C-alpha cells in the first residue's frame, strides 16, 4: 500500500463525518429562510369560495345583547343574506384580548354582522371577557369541544372569517386583528364583500 493511499483514508473519513453536519446546516438554513419569509396570517384556506359550514351552536348562557335580551346562539341562517364577520375567540387567548377593541369597533358598523364562536371556554369567563371589552357580537355560540371550529378550518384562536351575502367564505384572517391588517387587508375585503351582489 502506498503512502498516498494511507493519507487518503483519513481525509475521506473526515469528509464522511462532516457530510451529515453540512447537510443538516444546509437544510436548517433553507427551512429558516423559507419559514421566515412567509406571512402566517396568509395561510390559505380550502374553504375560501365555499359555503360557510352549517353551524348550530347554543348561545353563551347569561350573555345579553345590546338591547338587554339574551344573545342568540349561531344558526346556519346567520351566514346568508348579510356580510358577516365570524370571529373565533376565547377569554384565555392573549391575542384575543389585544384584538378585542378593534373587533368592538367593527361591531359598530351597521353594514356588517359580527358573529362570535367562543372556542373551548367557560361561559363565566366569556361573559367577563365581553363585559371588560364590550360585546361586538350579534350572535355568539359556545364551541365547548372545538368541533365547530374544526369545520371552519381553525388552526388556533383567534381567527376571523368574512362571509359574503351569498353565504360563501370570502376571506380568512389567521391571528389577531391588528391596526395594520385591519386597514391593509380586512377593511378592503369587507368593502369588496359589501360591493358584491
Model-predicted segments: where are they?
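A short beta-strand-turn-helix
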Residues: 55-84
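N-terminal targeting signals for export/organelle localization
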Residues: 1-62, 197
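Conserved segment of the thioredoxin-like fold in thiol-based oxidoreductases
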Residues: 108-145, 157
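Thiol/disulfide oxidoreductase modules built on the thioredoxin-like
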Residues: 131-136, 142-194
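Solvent-exposed loop/turn segments at secondary-structure junctions
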Residues: 90-94, 120-124, 146-148, 176-179
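Conserved redox-active cysteine motifs that mediate thiol-disulfide chemistry
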Residues: 88-105
Amino acid at each position: 500500500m502506498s503512502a498516498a493511499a494511507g493519507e487518503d483514508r483519513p481525509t475521506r473519513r473526515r469528509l464522511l463525518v462532516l457530510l451529515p453536519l453540512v447537510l443538516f446546516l444546509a437544510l436548517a438554513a433553507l427551512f429558516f429562510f423559507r419559514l421566515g419569509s412567509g406571512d402566517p396570517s396568509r395561510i390559505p384556506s380550502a374553504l375560501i369560495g365555499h359555503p360557510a359550514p352549517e353551524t348550530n351552536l347554543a348561545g353563551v348562557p347569561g350573555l345579553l345583547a345590546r338591547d338587554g335580551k339574551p344573545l342568540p346562539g349561531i344558526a346556519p341562517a346567520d351566514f346568508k343574506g348579510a356580510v358577516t364577520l365570524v370571529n373565533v375567540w376565547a377569554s384565555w387567548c392573549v391575542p384575543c384580548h389585544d384584538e378585542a377593541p378593534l373587533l368592538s369597533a367593527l361591531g359598530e358598523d351597521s353594514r356588517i354582522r359580527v358573529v362570535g364562536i367562543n372556542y373551548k371556554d367557560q361561559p363565566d369567563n366569556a361573559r367577563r371577557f365581553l363585559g371588560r371589552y364590550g360585546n361586538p357580537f350579534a350572535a355568539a355560540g359556545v364551541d365547548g369541544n372545538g368541533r365547530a371550529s374544526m369545520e371552519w378550518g381553525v388552526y388556533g384562536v383567534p381567527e376571523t372569517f368574512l362571509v359574503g351575502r351569498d353565504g360563501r367564505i370570502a376571506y380568512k384572517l389567521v391571528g389577531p386583528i391588528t391596526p395594520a391588517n385591519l386597514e391593509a387587508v380586512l377593511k378592503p375585503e369587507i368593502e369588496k364583500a359589501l360591493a358584491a351582489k
